Amino acid sequence: MLCIGNIERGDDGLGPCFAKMLKGKVSYEVIDAGVAPENQTGVIARLKPDTIVIVDAVYFEGEPGDIKIFSGEELGSGKISTHDVSPKLLIEYLKESTGAAIYILGIKPQSNKFGRGLSPSVEKTLNLLAEQLMEARLPSIRAA
């Protein structure tokens, strides 16, 4: 699991916050990539995963805190991420270097304005999702 985001920009920091919640509490590798996920590509390639789940704040129809699963191709094709740089290159590199299936677990942010802390709706979603992951109660991931 690759968690992305900037903790200095409100809900954009949901990835690193989620990584902190899960690290050491699940049976798979959780990487806090912060604002530079490209710096973790070597680590990920050495792990030889068959599936990579990228956790990030993503814009889509719905309410803040809503979750949507995207395929790597889906996110790479358009500007739905909160980041200025398209994640397309990262996704393509990870797919090429690992052969892994790549999914994006997108959580709709309420705000990505400067400032620390998550909105209540995003924090509630992360807590519920972390609880389910720690108890291994989630079904197989499928892109929407």
Protein language model features and the residues they cover:
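N-terminal catalytic or cofactor-binding beta/alpha core of small enzyme domains
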Residues: 1-109, 116-144
